[in-house]
Amino acid sequence: MNYIHQAQYYETDQMGIIHHSNYIRWMEEARIAYMDELGFPYKKVEEAGIISPVLSVQCDYKAMTYFGDRVCIDVKLSSFRGVKYEISYEMRDEKTGELRASATSAHCYLGKNGRPSNIKKELPELYAKMMEELQKVEKEQ
């Protein structure tokens, strides 16, 4: 799935480039849009009593992004093991295709009690969709 973010003036730093912390925010925006597109908005999942915290984030910065640039973020499910999953992101200039950053974020599914949630049992439709997405990505490789 592709998500477009237009770099905002308030996201720039003293050097006139997008501050590195904003790429992490863009990843979250793109991840939320990705889950919406799959038919499982975060709100719907949380209403079912399941939360999905971030376990880790890793981002490699390749080229600078400036105010007004439009960045296309390609979002893919890169692994899914029932409770834990990882999402990969490629952030490219929308016009030139230049790679600006590549990143991953790791997450898990927990019940509101903070314990791992068996979504295969508790949200079987989400589990099936995640498995379908993973198979789609594996076929592309």
What is the predicted function of each stretch?
Residues 1-72, 80-141:
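Terminal targeting signals and extreme-terminal segments of soluble enzymes
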